[in-house]
């Protein structure tokens, strides 16, 4: 399916999401959605809506797989933790640059509040709702991995490329 077709389809399908979205969610569901929104923002904030959706879909595909943690936050935060911080300060701090999702352990502040009134944040929230409610439509053909198109990670030779959406290349 071509990207333009996917974008049109996703746009049309998204129009129905608010009708299906539950106004009441549990605290745990809210936490998981926040992890998803944060990951989409920091991994794909500069991408078009379909690119944000694709990154979120990779996370959701990992949650469904038995090869990864079974929660959104578990998938997003997967990686080794700094044992010194855990032992001395009783804090879970990721080892820098060793995470599955680079924003989580790049040493930069990951505050979402400065994005609160932007179109980017609204797109992220829309993608999060879409993925939480209508998660049976794929724009990545089942991808569980992706990378920016300006890098060439060693792991990509072991996977099959499914699609490229703007600056991200997706694999399964």
Q: What do these predicted ranges mean?
A:
Residues 9-14:
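Gram-negative bacterial Sec-dependent N-terminal signal peptides
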Residues 16-18:
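N-terminal signal peptide c-region/cleavage motif recognized by signal peptidases
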Residues 1-7:
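Bacterial N-terminal signal peptides that target proteins for export
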Residues 20-172:
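Bacterial extracytoplasmic/cell-wall-associated proteins, especially those involved in peptidoglycan
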């Amino acid at each position: 399916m071509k990207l333009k077709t996917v974008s049109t389809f996703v746009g049309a399908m998204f129009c129905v999401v608010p009708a299906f979205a539950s106004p009441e969610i549990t605290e745990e569901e809210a936490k998981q959605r926040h992890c998803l929104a944060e990951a989409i923002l920091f991994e794909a904030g500069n991408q078009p809506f379909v690119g944000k959706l694709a990154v979120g879909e990779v996370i959701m595909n990992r949650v469904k797989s038995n090869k990864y943690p079974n929660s959104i936050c578990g998938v997003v935060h997967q990686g080794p933790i700094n044992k010194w911080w855990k032992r001395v300060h009783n804090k879970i701090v990721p080892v820098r640059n060793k995470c599955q999702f680079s924003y989580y352990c790049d040493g930069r502040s990951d505050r979402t509040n400065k994005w609160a009134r932007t179109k980017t944040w609204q797109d992220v929230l829309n993608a999060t709702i879409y993925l939480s409610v209508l998660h049976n439509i794929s724009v990545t053909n089942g991808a569980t991995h992706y990378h920016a198109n300006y890098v060439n990670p060693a792991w990509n030779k072991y996977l099959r490329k499914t699609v490229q959406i703007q600056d991200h290349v997706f694999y399964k």
